[in-house]
């Protein structure tokens, strides 16, 4: 058997019907579309049009708003930071900043910086320079003799 010997099973596929090639073909003149009207024309559907009925996107109410003063922190747990230290991606001698965390692949850059959360176990004494931290994270860091400096988050408009 060769590649050029392979073919579909007989009767498994049907060749497409060429329409509009004379009335003798059976699909001439109106090409199987019936007679006049919107459905006989090309480009039948008007997106979102429901025949004059109020469309669903106008029937449903608008909801919520985007708060320009909200803070969007990238949350990182202490256990995740310890994993990066164990893998040799974070240097314990240098302060842990958002740039260091992004470079280590611990998190992506967030609009308002990083928030450290206390889930997991931290074994190394570290100095943190981050936008925010939970009470449990601060307690765990200070218990090991480390320190944490909370930076004031820069507004997104100031970066542009």
UniProtKB/Swiss-Prot annotation:
Keyword Ribonucleoprotein set for record: yes
Family: Belongs to the universal ribosomal protein uL15 family.
Cellular compartments per GO CC: cytosolic large ribosomal subunit
Keywords: Ribonucleoprotein, Ribosomal protein, RNA-binding, rRNA-binding
Subunit: Part of the 50S ribosomal subunit.
Cell inner membrane found in the keyword field: no
Gene field: rplO
Compositionally skewed regions (Gly residues) per UniProt: 21-35
Name under which the protein is recorded: Large ribosomal subunit protein uL15
Region (Disordered): 1-35
GO molecular function: rRNA binding; structural constituent of ribosome
Pfam families: Ribosomal_L27A
Gene3D superfamilies reported for this sequence: 3.100.10.10
Biological process per Gene Ontology, one example term: translation
Biased composition, class Polar residues, residue ranges: 1-14
Reported function: Binds to the 23S rRNA.
């Amino acid at each position: 058997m060769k590649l050029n010997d392979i073919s579909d099973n007989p009767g498994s596929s049907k060749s497409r019907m060429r329409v509009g090639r004379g009335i003798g073909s059976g699909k001439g003149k109106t090409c199987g579309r019936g007679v006049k009207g919107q459905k006989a024309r090309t480009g039948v559907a008007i997106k979102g049009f429901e025949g004059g009925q109020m469309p669903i996107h106008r029937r449903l109410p608008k909801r919520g708003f985007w708060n320009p003063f909200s803070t969007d922190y990238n949350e990182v747990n202490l256990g995740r930071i310890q994993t990066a230290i164990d893998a040799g991606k974070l240097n314990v001698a240098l302060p842990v900043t958002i740039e260091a965390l992004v470079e280590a692949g611990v998190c992506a850059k967030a609009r308002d910086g990083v928030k450290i959360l206390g889930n997991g176990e931290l074994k190394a004494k570290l100095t943190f320079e981050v936008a925010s931290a939970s009470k449990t994270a601060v307690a765990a860091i200070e218990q090991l003799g480390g320190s944490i400096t909370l930076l004031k988050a820069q507004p997104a408009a100031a970066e542009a």
